[in-house]
Amino acid sequence: VSLSDLANEQFILLERGTDDEITPLFRRAGLAVRSKLSTWDDYAIMAMVEDGLGVSILPALILRRCQFDVAVRPLEGHPHRQINAIYRTADVSLAAARFLEYL
């Protein structure tokens, strides 16, 4: 599915501070997002999509265990996001330190 295919759909956005991740993605493609609904919870978004209130773009990680009756389609261009690890250096266990080295 391309962003232009979704441009006329009503979106349910995941709030992250003052901006979501979908709006900038559309903006970079020269498109606008139509949205009236937003929430802080991925599962609430999936429930709203299941109820026919709109569509959304969610991380593949959360969709792997999706138990809602919704269609899951890959997005063209494979957009990605950066995820960071934040930790207190004084409290890192040996196992956690090894994991961070691996990253």
Identify the role of each PLM range.
Residues 1-3, 9-10, 80-85:
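Small-molecule pocket liners
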Residues 71-103:
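A late-sequence structural motif
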Residues 4, 46-47, 97:
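Alpha-helical segments flanking ligand/cofactor-binding loops in enzyme cores
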Residues 16, 60-62, 89:
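Short secondary-structure boundary segments
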Residues 13-15, 32-41:
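Short beta-strand-to-loop elements that line the ligand-binding cleft
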Residues 9-29, 93-97:
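Secondary-structure junction motif
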